[in-house]
Regions:
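Small cysteine-rich, disulfide-bonded extracellular modules of the LU/uPAR three-finger superfamily
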Residues: 1-84, 88-125
């Protein structure tokens, strides 16, 4: 993922100096139309379209990559989605990271957008 959010940067800074922040216990992937370091992902589709964030399990010793494909199912059109985000909750919660999809996904009818296994990478640099 291209960028950690300000929230995630603050978590890391507190962890590095031993302040023991409350770390996420799960990660959820989201799709959207943009993003910023301050707010994270922007333009998530409405739940009425069948959209829901997907749980993500990661593996790796340095760079963390999604173990399994992520499948976002939609019951109707959502247009073009260009970004992916990582959150600490299935709804609401805190944005942790965001970045652009390798290829924008356009969905003009019901269907599924799949993010392949090992294509979502989280790396602090």
């Amino acid at each position: 993922m291209a960028s950690l959010t300000d929230y995630a940067k603050n978590l890391l800074a507190r962890a590095l100096v031993g302040r023991q922040p409350s770390l996420p216990v799960a990660a959820w992937a989201a799709l959207g139309t943009g993003g910023t370091d301050a707010a994270g992902l922007a333009g998530e589709p409405a739940a009425a379209s069948g959209y829901a964030r997907q749980p993500v399990a990661f593996t790796g010793s340095g760079a963390q990559r999604n173990i399994a494909p992520l499948r976002f199912a939609f019951t109707g059109s959502v247009g073009t989605l260009t970004h992916v985000g990582l959150y600490d909750a299935v709804a609401g919660g805190n944005a942790l990271a965001w970045g652009t999809l390798g290829t924008p996904a356009t969905l003009n009818a019901a269907g599924t957008i799949t993010v392949p296994a090992e294509s979502l990478t989280v790396l602090a640099d």
